Swiss-Prot record:
GO CC annotation terms, alphabetical: cytoplasm
NCBIfam families: aroA
GO MF annotation, one: 3-phosphoshikimate 1-carboxyvinyltransferase activity
Species of the source: Staphylococcus aureus (strain Mu3 / ATCC 700698)
PANTHER family membership: AROM/DEHYDROQUINATE SYNTHASE (PTHR21090), PENTAFUNCTIONAL AROM POLYPEPTIDE (PTHR21090:SF5)
Protein family per UniProt: Belongs to the EPSP synthase family.
Protein name in UniProt: 3-phosphoshikimate 1-carboxyvinyltransferase
Chain residues that bind phosphoenolpyruvate: 23, 95, 123, 169, 348, 390
């Protein structure tokens, strides 16, 4: 991944757009539709590189998945008819694919090997392996912490598990494994984390009880699964880049339609409101996965903010671009309790600070977050996504604060979650 992209976009940004389907929900919809015997339609899925890795793996297990315009048609023989794969299951750059399938394949008892790219090979897997081994999963990694993960058949038992980190991926790995146990599993969370697995289990007829910080599964829950059609809302993590772009670019007025606003994911909306940003939600729908249209207008004199506690997991993937937003506030902002950023595609505490500081902004990395001072774009250094899609898009948004073009190395990383990101940003420039 060595592509360079020159970003030359100026404001104001004006217009109405949709963003690609939610990445987290697309992964889970493919997994659940594949487990269920019969046909499921997944509408407006995200077909970035990460979700394609998930699709490819289920095809190897014997599931027929067809792309049909803006939907996926999943025809599955059901989990009981899955084939043993006779090759390594390649997860690419996808932590979601790797960690959730570690649980799912352990539960299924299918002999398999999960392995990803160089970035995935550096990301910790012990947080998933520990609870799975407590469930009697036969799963091993390099140094008990890294891919490749080798899975062998076993009989999964239920556990009572106190989460060590607020991680939806760890929680979901346990939940997927627990589907195949004839015991009850109880998970106690530290903080609220995204709950798409729980809401989508119900959508596919799998019984599950969820209170605020406690989740309980039913014995032999997999036997209840049924195929279902699912409409994937727009990804709020992708919408975040346009929300921030409109807030920091004079005279901008942007509306994003059909964005998922699940309360476990909508931290960026809470943060923008606390900072005094001009943001309005309308056309709201309710249901398992609520949606809204979001209108954002340029807002000078944003108020500084401290982001900590339960707000952090609700905005974890958006924190790099939120850090950029905080540079435009009238005082110093702080992000705390965000150690989870260290184990993303890159250490996002360091990469966010390093890349924005190169451009003249003033950010100090801390052990669990960032201190962000009011600062401006001062120098047109060449920056680098470091193969992290969210860093690449954040830097493209930062370029709106420069009067000169900005060169970003390894920009094609954005295709992981948002193919067509740059043309969509340019569309708003042209409509302005």
């Amino acid at each position: 991944m060595v592509s360079e992209q020159i970003i030359d976009i100026s404001g104001p940004l004006k217009g109405e757009i949709e963003v690609p389907g939610d990445k987290s929900m697309t992964h889970r919809a493919i997994m659940l539709a594949s487990l269920a015997e019969g046909t499921s339609n997944i509408y407006k899925p995200l077909l970035g590189e990460d979700c394609r890795r998930t699709m490819d793996i289920f095809r190897l297990l014997g599931v027929d998945i067809k792309e049909d315009e803006d939907k996926l048609v999943v025809n599955s023989p059901g989990y009981k008819a899955f084939k043993t794969p006779h090759q390594v299951l390649y997860t690419g750059n996808s932590g979601t694919t790797t960690r959730l399938l570690a649980g799912l394949l352990s539960g299924l008892g299918i002999e398999s090997v999960l392995s990803g790219d160089v970035s995935i090979g550096k990301r910790p897997m012990d947080r998933v392996l520990r609870p799975l081994k407590l469930m009697d999963a036969n799963i091993e990694g390099i140094e008990d912490n890294y891919t490749p993960l080798i899975i062998k058949p076993s009989v999964i038992k239920g556990i009572n598990y106190q989460m060590e980190v607020a991680s939806a991926q760890v929680k979901s790995a346990i939940l997927f494994a627990s589907l195949f146990s004839n015991d009850t599993t109880v998970i106690k969370e530290l903080d609220v984390s995204r709950n798409h697995t729980e809401t989508m289990f119900r959508h596919f007829n799998i019984p599950i009880e969820a209170e605020r910080l406690s989740i309980t599964t039913t014995p032999d829950a997999i036997q209840h699964i049924k195929p279902a059609d699912f409409h994937v809302p727009g990804d709020i993590s992708s919408a975040a880049f346009f929300i921030v772009a409109a807030l920091i670019t004079p005279e901008s007025d942007v509306t994003i339609h059909n964005v998922g606003i699940n309360p476990t994911r909508s931290g960026i909306i809470d943060i923008v409101e606390k900072m005094g940003g001009n943001i309005q939600l309308f056309n709201q729908t309710t249901g398992a996965e609520p949606t809204a249209s979001i209108r954002i207008q340029y807002t000078p004199m944003l108020q500084p903010i401290t982001i900590e506690g339960e707000l952090v997991p609700k905005a974890i993937d958006e924190l790099p671009v939120i850090a950029l937003l905080c540079t435009q506030a009238v005082g110093t902002s702080t992000i705390k309790d965000a150690e989870e950023l260290k184990v993303k595609e890159t250490n996002r505490i360091d990469t966010t600070a390093d890349m924005l500081n190169l451009l003249g902004f003033e950010l100090q990395p801390t052990n669990d977050g960032l201190i962000i001072h009011p600062s401006e774009f001062k120098t047109n250094a060449t920056v680098d996504s470091l193969t992290d899609h969210r860093i690449g898009m954040m830097l493209a948004v930062a370029s709106l604060l420069s009067s000169e073009p900005v060169k970003i190395k390894q920009f094609d990383a954005v295709n992981v979650s948002f193919p067509g990101f740059l043309p969509k940003l340019k569309l708003l420039e042209n409509e302005g």
